[in-house]
C-alpha cells in the first residue's frame, strides 16, 4: 500500500542527518554525501531488490519483473552547499515509496522490471560539472575533458572520484545500464514560481531548456579617470553595461530567459577608465530556433555597442552549449492524466534548470518529468519548501504515472 506520509517522514529524517541551520550539505564526493547514500541503502532492507553502483557511481536498485523491459525512476541525494531539503532527494524517496507499493502488490514479481537510480553528482557543486553520473550513463560525458578539474581546495576531480571507488577513465562503462530501459520518470520540485503563481500543486514538464552560455569581452583603453574627458574615453564597461539592459529587450521579443551573471573589469581600480570588461551571458529556451535568435541578437547588440564606444569587435568565448530536450509526448499525456486524477487540474511548463532526465532523454529513452509546486519559488536555498499536502499529492501522482507507464511498456 502506498504511504506518501512515509516519504515526508524520510525526507525529514534525511534532513536531520545531513543538514544544519544553514541548509543541506550533501555535496557529492564528500563524507556527508556518502553518509546519505548509506542511509538510503539501509532503507532497502527487506525489499526483494538488487542494489549496485555502476562505473560512474550511480546507485541502482532493481526489482526484477516478468519482463526484462525496465521502467526507470530517478533522483539524486547530492545537494548544493546550504541547499534545501527536497531538491533531488524528493525524487528518489518518492520513487522508493512507489517501488515498495509495486513490490508488495505484485509479491516481488511485477509485470515489468522496475529500477530506481540515485544519480551521482547531479549538482556539480564541488567541481563545476553538473549531471556527471547521468551524462556517463547517456554517453555524452567526455572524461578526458574533465580530468583537470579541481575544487576550491585544489583537490582533483579524479582523486575525489577514486576515493569513492570511481575511476574517471571508466565512467562511460555506465552506459551498460541503458540495456532494456523502456521509460524514465522523474518527479522534482519546480524550483521556480510558475505553479505557485497559478495556485496549482503539480505540473507536467514538456522538456528542458537548451542553453547558450558565453563569456563576452569588450576591450577599450585604460586612462586616468580625472584627466580624460568623457567624450574621449574608450570605456569597455560602458559597452558591457548597455548589454545588461538590452538582453531584457531581446528576451521579451523571443521568449526564454537570459542572465548576465558576472562582470569582471580590468584594471579594476577607481582611478582608471576600464580597459577590459568580461561579462558572462546565459540564455535558455525550449525552442532551438528561438534560442539561436537569442544568441544572434545578443551578438549583434554587443557589436553595435562596441562600435558606438569606439571599441574593436568584442570577443565571444563559448563556455557551454546544450540543445533543448523535448520529453516523450505519450508520457506527457500519461503525466497529465495522473495529475488530473489526484489534483483535478494540470498545467504544462518547460524546465529552465537542467536535470538528469535530460541526459536520459538524450540517450533515446522515452522520458517525462513531473513538477510539484515550490513555496517562495525558491530552491538551492535553506528556505526551499513545499506544502506537505502537495508532497503527498506528488507521490500519489507519480504512483499513477508509473502504473500507466508500466501498462504502456507492456503493450509496446
Predicted features along the sequence, with ranges:
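A non-catalytic alpha/beta surface segment that caps or lines the substrate-entry region
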Residues: 19-64
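His/Asp/Glu-rich mid-to-C-terminal helical/loop segments that flank catalytic regions of hydrolases
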Residues: 206, 224, 228-253, 300, ...
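A short beta-alpha structural unit
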Residues: 25-29, 261-269, 280-286, 313-332, ...
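Zn-dependent metallopeptidase/amidohydrolase metal-coordination segment
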Residues: 7, 12-17, 74-75, 275, ...
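N-terminal capping segment at the start of a domain
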Residues: 1-31, 145, 378-379
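Alpha-helical metal-binding/catalytic segments enriched in His/Glu/Asp
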Residues: 73, 82-123, 212-218, 224-251, ...
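Catalytic-core environment of secreted peptidases
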Residues: 43, 47, 59-90
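Midchain, well-structured core segments that form catalytic/ion-binding scaffolds
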Residues: 121-122, 126-289
Amino acid at each position: 500500500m502506498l504511504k506518501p506520509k512515509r516519504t515526508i517522514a524520510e525526507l525529514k529524517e534525511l534532513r536531520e542527518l545531513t543538514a544544519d541551520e544553514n541548509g543541506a550539505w550533501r555535496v557529492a564526493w564528500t563524507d556527508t554525501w556518502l553518509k546519505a547514500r548509506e542511509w538510503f541503502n539501509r532503507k532497502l532492507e527487506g525489499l526483494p531488490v538488487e542494489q549496485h553502483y555502476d562505473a560512474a557511481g550511480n546507485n541502482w536498485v532493481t526489482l526484477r519483473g516478468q519482463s526484462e523491459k525496465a521502467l526507470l525512476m530517478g533522483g539524486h541525494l547530492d545537494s548544493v552547499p546550504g541547499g534545501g531539503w527536497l531538491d533531488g532527494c524528493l525524487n528518489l524517496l518518492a520513487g522508493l515509496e512507489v517501488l515498495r507499493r509495486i513490490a508488495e502488490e505484485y509479491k516481488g514479481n511485477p509485470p515489468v522490471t522496475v529500477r530506481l537510480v540515485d544519480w551521482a553528482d547531479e549538482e556539480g557543486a564541488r567541481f563545476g560539472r553538473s549531471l556527471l553520473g547521468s551524462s556517463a550513463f547517456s554517453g555524452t560525458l567526455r572524461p578526458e575533458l574533465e580530468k583537470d578539474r579541481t575544487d576550491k581546495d585544489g583537490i582533483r576531480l579524479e582523486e575525489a572520484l577514486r576515493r569513492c571507488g570511481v575511476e574517471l577513465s571508466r565512467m562511460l562503462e555506465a552506459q551498460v545500464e541503458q540495456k532494456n530501459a523502456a521509460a524514465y520518470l522523474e518527479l522534482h520540485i519546480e524550483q521556480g514560481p510558475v505553479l505557485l503563481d497559478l495556485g496549482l500543486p503539480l505540473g507536467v514538464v514538456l522538456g528542458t531548456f537548451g542553453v547558450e552560455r558565453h563569456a563576452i569581452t569588450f576591450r577599450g583603453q585604460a586612462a586616468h579617470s580625472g584627466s580624460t574627458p568623457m567624450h574621449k574615453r574608450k570605456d569597455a564597461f560602458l559597452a558591457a553595461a548597455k548589454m545588461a539592459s538590452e538582453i531584457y529587450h531581446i528576451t521579451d521579443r523571443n521568449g526564454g530567459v537570459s542572465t548576465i551573471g558576472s562582470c569582471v573589469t580590468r584594471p579594476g581600480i577607481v582611478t582608471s577608465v576600464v580597459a577590459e570588461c568580461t561579462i558572462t551571458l546565459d540564455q535558455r529556451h525550449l525552442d532551438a530556433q528561438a534560442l539561436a535568435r537569442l544568441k544572434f541578437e545578443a551578438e549583434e547588440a554587443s557589436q553595435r555597442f562596441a562600435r558606438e564606444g569606439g571599441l574593436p569587435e568584442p570577443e565571444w568565448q563559448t563556455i557551454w552549449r546544450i540543445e533543448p530536450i523535448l520529453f516523450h509526448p505519450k508520457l506527457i499525456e500519461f503525466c497529465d492524466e495522473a495529475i488530473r486524477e489526484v489534483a483535478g487540474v494540470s498545467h504544462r511548463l518547460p524546465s529552465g534548470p537542467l536535470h538528469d532526465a535530460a541526459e536520459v532523454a538524450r540517450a533515446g529513452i522515452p522520458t517525462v518529468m513531473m513538477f510539484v509546486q515550490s513555496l517562495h519559488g525558491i530552491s538551492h536555498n535553506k528556505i526551499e519548501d513545499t506544502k506537505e499536502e502537495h508532497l503527498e499529492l506528488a507521490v500519489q501522482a507519480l504512483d499513477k504515472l508509473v502504473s500507466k507507464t508500466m501498462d504502456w511498456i507492456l503493450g509496446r
